[in-house]
Amino acid sequence: MNEALALIVEDDEDLNEVFRQALAAAGFSTESAYDGRTALEFLEKISPSIVILDLHLPFVSGETILKKIHSTPSLENIRVVITTADAAAAEFLRDQADLVLVKPISYIQLRDLTKRLNPVLQTDKFKTPPRTE
């Protein structure tokens, strides 16, 4: 069985691994990027169903990656979960993502994230449906 693909873009190796384990347990296959440049390279090669995106990254910012996702037709339907320790940035970007998690991220937030992602796994051939608001 093919799995939906999640791209985890988080420079904190421990948090990246926590996301990887949680998403794998929820049924996703995962790829990890630890900086913005690598994330952009992945997005040129793969089409994930979801991107877990830290805002503060080495080389290329999460905001730049978010703009790239929204401005590229082949990427615009990817679900995006923003992670940041900056509550003001989180509020500012709330309407540009499917979900915003403010760090530190609790177990409950992580559990709720995987529950919210379950519909992604149920879509035909794991195509991410268009965002509805």
What does each model-found stretch correspond to?
Residues 32-50:
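Acidic, metal-coordinating helix/loop segments flanking the phosphotransfer/catalytic sites
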